[in-house]
Amino acid sequence: MIEADRLIQPQVQGQDELIDRAMRPKMLDEYTGQDDTRAQLKVFIQAAINRREALDHMLIFGPPGLGKTTLAMIVANEMGVNIKSTSGPVLEKAGDLAALLTNLEEGDVLFIDEIHRLSPVVEEILYPAMEDYQLDIMIGDGPAARSIKLDLPPFTLIGATTRAGALTSPLRARFGIPLRLEFYNVADLTTIVTRSANVMNLEIDEQGAIEIAKRSRGTPRIANRLLRRVRDYAEVKHDGKVSQTVAEYALDLLDVDDQGFDYLDRKLLLAIIDKFMGGPVGLDNLAAAIGEDRETIEDVLEPFLIQQGFIQRTPRGRIASQRAYDHFSLVRPEKA
C-alpha cells in the first residue's frame, strides 16, 4: 500500500482538511480554474434560483485533490442553503442515510464523498429519495413488516468520486448534472498558491509561486501542502520570504523534482523502463515489481503520468513514452 506520509499524495492526510478549509474559496467568483465547469455551474445555479427550485442532483468526478468538496460547499453557498456532508463508507445501514435525509430542509445540499462505495442497501434507499423526494422505510419485522413512505423536502444530492465508472448505472443515471474536474494548469495553480500564501500572511514572489505550482502535479491540495513545507524552510533557513531559489532548494530537499515526481513515480517509470524494457507490461506485473497494489497505480500514480505523457496505456499493457526516457536522460532502445 502507498505510504501515508507521501508528500505529493493527492488524498487528504494529517491536518490537510482543517488547513484546506481555511484556504477554500467560498463563492464561484473566488474559484480558480476549471473554467468550463465554473461557467456551467453559474448557469445551473442561477436558473435554479430564478425558478426557486432545488438544484438538480450533481455528480462531481475526477482525480483526488482537485476540489470536489470545495465545489460542493460553493454550490451550497451560492444557493444560500445548508450542506450536510458524509461519505459512502460511513453510510453502512439504510438508517444512517434515512437519518440524514429526514433532517434536510428545503433546498439543502447533501454531499456524499466516495459515493461509489455506497452499499447496495443504502443505494436502494437513495433512488426514490433522488427521483421522487420520498423515503421508503420498513416498519416491524417478519410477516408484520410494512413499508411506509415519508415525503422529503426537495434537496440536492452532490456525489463525489474518483471512480465514476465504479458507480452502478441506475445511480449514475439519476444525476442530472455530471461534472468532470481536470488537472489544473501551472497558471491557475500559481494563482492558487499566491492566494493561499496571502491567507497564510506569507510573502512570496511570482517566480516562487510558479516553482511550487510546476511541481504540484496539477493538484491544488498538493500545491497547498508544498507551500506549507516551503514556508517552513523559508522561515528556518532564510528570511521567511519565498523566492524561486528558496522554493527550488526546499522542494529539492523534499525530493520533489521539477516534474512533481517523488521516489514512487520514479520507481514506477524506471520499473517499466529497466525491468520490462519499456513495456508493454500488465498492471499485475507492474504492481508486483514496485510493491504496490493495482488500485494505487490506477487511481493515484497513473492519472498524472498518463496526462503528462510519461506513460501510455495500451490494450497490451503500460508503455514508457519517449518523454519518460528523456526525463532520466536515457536512450530508448529500438524495438525489433
UniProtKB/Swiss-Prot annotation:
Mg(2+) binds at T69. Disulfide bonds: none annotated. This is Holliday junction branch migration complex subunit RuvB. Its EC number is 3.6.4.-. One of its GO terms (molecular function) is ATP binding. The keyword DNA damage applies. Belongs to the RuvB family. Residues 185-255 are annotated as: Small ATPAse domain (RuvB-S). SUPFAM superfamilies: P-loop containing nucleoside triphosphate hydrolases, Winged helix' DNA-binding domain. NCBIfam families: PRK00080.1 (NF000868), ruvB (TIGR00635). The keyword Hydrolase applies. Keywords: ATP-binding, Cytoplasm, DNA damage, DNA recombination, DNA repair, DNA-binding, Hydrolase, Nucleotide-binding. It catalyses: ATP + H2O = ADP + phosphate + H(+). Its main location: cytoplasm. Signal peptide: none annotated. GO terms for cellular component: cytoplasm; Holliday junction resolvase complex. It is found in: Cytoplasm. ATP binds at R24, G65, K68, T69, T70, E131, D132, Y133, R174, Y184, R221. It comes from Shewanella frigidimarina (strain NCIMB 400). DNA binds at R294, R313, R318. Homohexamer. Forms an RuvA(8)-RuvB(12)-Holliday junction (HJ) complex. HJ DNA is sandwiched between 2 RuvA tetramers; dsDNA enters through RuvA and exits via RuvB. An RuvB hexamer assembles on each DNA strand where it exits the tetramer. Each RuvB hexamer is contacted by two RuvA subunits (via domain III) on 2 adjacent RuvB subunits; this complex drives branch migration. In the full resolvosome a probable DNA-RuvA(4)-RuvB(12)-RuvC(2) complex forms which resolves the HJ. Residues 258-336 are annotated as: Head domain (RuvB-H). The RuvA-RuvB-RuvC complex processes Holliday junction (HJ) DNA during genetic recombination and DNA repair, while the RuvA-RuvB complex plays an important role in the rescue of blocked DNA replication forks via replication fork reversal (RFR). RuvA specifically binds to HJ cruciform DNA, conferring on it an open structure. The RuvB hexamer acts as an ATP-dependent pump, pulling dsDNA into and through the RuvAB complex. RuvB forms 2 homohexamers on either side of HJ DNA bound by 1 or 2 RuvA tetramers; 4 subunits per hexamer contact DNA at a time.
